[in-house]
Amino acid sequence: YSLYSGGSVVNLAIELNGQPPLQVYVKPCKEYHITLRSIDMGAMEVIRNYEELQDYKKVGSPFSIPKAALTLAGFAPAFSTESYPSLAKQLEDFGSGIEITLLAAIPAGSGLGTSSILASTVLGAINDFCGLAWDRNDICSYTLALEQLLTTGGGWHDQYGGVFPGVKLLQSEAGFEQNPLVRWLPDALFTHPDYRDCHLLYYTGITRTAKGILAEIVSSMFLNSGPHLSLLAEMKVHATDMSEAILRGN
């Protein structure tokens, strides 16, 4: 929808219990392989070759996201500017192995955009570790590409909402290349003592996978479904109305 009509969304980045709920740590290791760890899932995987690294298309796998992120960062032949006979040789040329540790303190399928924001966090950590000089907009764009690699698809609102702090209105123009403009909004309705206690983030325990929902919406778009297109247009207007209400302190 954003490609031919432009998109609008009001988004709020929050911490949970005073901590960033998604955290990623990257450090070098002496062995020329890649070690992936998940604190919340209690899982670990050691990657020693390109085939294992590019095995990232299993939806729900604990390490699909870091595998795809490393692939995009150039640690797989398809995205590398140089050719190497093996992953071990590439890591040796890089100077070390890599160890990535993930912590996701949000239930999977919560609807809070966890997967997209985690992907951006992993890409950001790899960017810092490897000195790739990506900015926030680059990271959000690469997150779109990463989700295509995972076959889950997705839009841009989740990662922009998490990577850029605070309350904001995100808007994009129609066109194949989506570069949303970030307009920050006042946060008094969420932080002022008179209003702060009016907001509650409550976990129902109900989960869902975005892939199926996205497939249904995209299919309806291709079929030019009137009801679906009408709802999407209403959602875009609703975002603008909501931003105006926040600006008015209403």
Region spans (language model):
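A sequence/structural signal of beta-propeller blade repeats
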Residues: 136-137
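Short hydrophobic "helix-edge" motifs at membrane interfaces and signal-peptide entry regions
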Residues: 104-106, 148-149, 155
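Glycine/charged-rich beta-loop-alpha catalytic/anionic-binding loops adjacent to active sites
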Residues: 47-54, 96-108
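C-terminal nucleotide
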Residues: 1-92, 132, 141-151, 159-250
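Conserved phosphate/anionic-ligand binding catalytic regions in large, soluble enzymes, centered on
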Residues: 116, 154-155, 159
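Helix-loop-helix module between adjacent transmembrane segments
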Residues: 69, 108-110
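DPxDG-like acidic metal-binding loop motif
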Residues: 110-132
